[in-house]
Amino acid sequence: MVFAHDTEEALIAAAALVNTAEEPDSLLSTQDLATFYVEAGWKGQHAGDEGELTDVKELRPTLRRMWLADIPEQVECVNSLLREASALPQVVRHDEFDWHLHATTPEQPLATRMAVEAAMALVDVLRMGETERLKVCDAQGCEHIFADLSRNRSRRYCSVACSNRMAAAAYRDRKSDADDEPSMSAGSPTDEEQ
């Protein structure tokens, strides 16, 4: 594990939220948000109304900017998100998780909790000097972000699907290059015969 469990979960959830904005947008309705809420493992207050959907959608560009920024801008964004939410870090233990930090209460609005959890995770990334783990997928045509949690920081793609797509494209390119090379057929002269 590169970071504490709660940090890794928050990074994964933040990237997943940002990636919902990529075409086609996958947060178009309150039902889409309800599905995302469950799949991303969120707990606590979830109004499930249009206002909450709007607030969550408006958070996505801020998180993407924070993810891709240089370190001084990341710090500024983190501090701004924490300040706006009046975040107050508390050590807590709940469910199956051991002691960890939360800087919001479960009763605060979902978008606020999402912003603060992402900001708190980025605090850990910054403090450990691991910002190079915040990446954009290398697959052609994909702009998804992800946290590279591999041991050697070598992950290049946001998903297995992108990795497979790029591997297949590279194979087709190699195959095409091999097919374009002149072959030595039975009737062609060799260098010695010329």
Task: Please place each PLM-identified region on the residue numbering.
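Short helix-coil boundary/hinge micro-motifs
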Residues: 1-136, 140-148, 178-194
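Short metal-binding segments enriched for Cys and/or His
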Residues: 165-176
